[in-house]
Amino acid sequence: DYWWWSDGLYMVMPVMTKLYKVTGNHLYLDKLYEYIVYSDSIMLDRETGLYYRDAKYVYPKHKTSSGKKDFWARGDGWVLAGLAKVLKDLPADYEHRSFFVNKYVKLAEAVAAIQQPEGYWTRSMMDPTHAPGPETSGTAFFTYGFLWGINNGYLDEAVYKPVIDKAWNYLAKTALQKNGKIGYVQPIGEKAIPGQVVDADSEANFGVGAFLLAACEYVRYLEAPENQDRAYWCNLLYKMAAPVLSNMAEGNLKKNMLVEVSPNWDGRNKGVTYMETFGRLMAGVAPWLTLPDDDTEEGQMRK
């Protein structure tokens, strides 16, 4: 009966997979599976794939003010982020790995489907009127979870990137304040509370942590080779290098590549200097130029 609330899944699941990695003791993986099965039995809504915060909030015993199922955003954020961290460390041949993969994917699908048009998720995710307005901690955890899934090949970028774009727009332009603080974070709690004020001044350390978690994963996404606009940068390199190289080849460097400088440039009284000022530029271009020629447009540029 250890894992009876959603926060606990984030707190303990990743620790168990880390302990397995450190010790090699398979007991940690056995108990990981045993305990999550227990958690599912008391707080997983199998119809939606979402988690209730704990057994007190299971429908129909508990309902929102509109009579709907009440799924707490930060609670499901803990779970999605926790599953991402677990998958990172689970061995490829673990007998229950597909169980965790399917759980993660289904939860991601369920969460993405109920995003608000403004990019955030409300505190009660399936009933925006119950406690209306944005909530940052849950939104940030979801954003991290989606980005991790794309970065590691579990989620379809074409499906989830639009969701991430809207969520990050909210996080970067609304949640992040001009003074660097992270607002719209629901205080410590366990449910969406009608009438509770959550505004730009509402801050909490777990909101900041979730924001940073999402931001770091977004940087990893942006730094992935397939997301770099190689064609743009290669074209820019070509435009910088071509005039220099063509004049060098024709022996016209000093004639055609004069550069005006300050009279006291480098301590020397010169009106012009030759290619000295292009040295660093060309040093930066050189690694690209040394790549082999090929039949691509980029290869022909180098040729």
Model-derived segments and their meaning:
Residues 1, 26-52, 101-119, 163-181, ...:
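Long, well-ordered core segments of solenoidal/helical folds
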Residues 1-3, 7, 49-72, 118-139, ...:
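Carbohydrate-binding/catalytic loop surfaces
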Residues 5-21, 72-88, 135-151, 203-219, ...:
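Well-ordered alpha-helical segments within folded domains of soluble proteins
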Residues 19-33, 87-106, 112, 149-166, ...:
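Structural helix-adjacent loops and short alpha-helical linkers that scaffold large soluble proteins
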Residues 32-126:
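Active-site cradle of extracellular carbohydrate-active enzymes
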Residues 133-225, 246-263:
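CBM-like carbohydrate-recognition segments
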Residues 227-260, 266-278:
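N-terminal basic, low-complexity leaders that serve as flexible interaction/assembly modules and, when applicable
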Residues 265-303:
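Membrane helical hairpin/interfacial module
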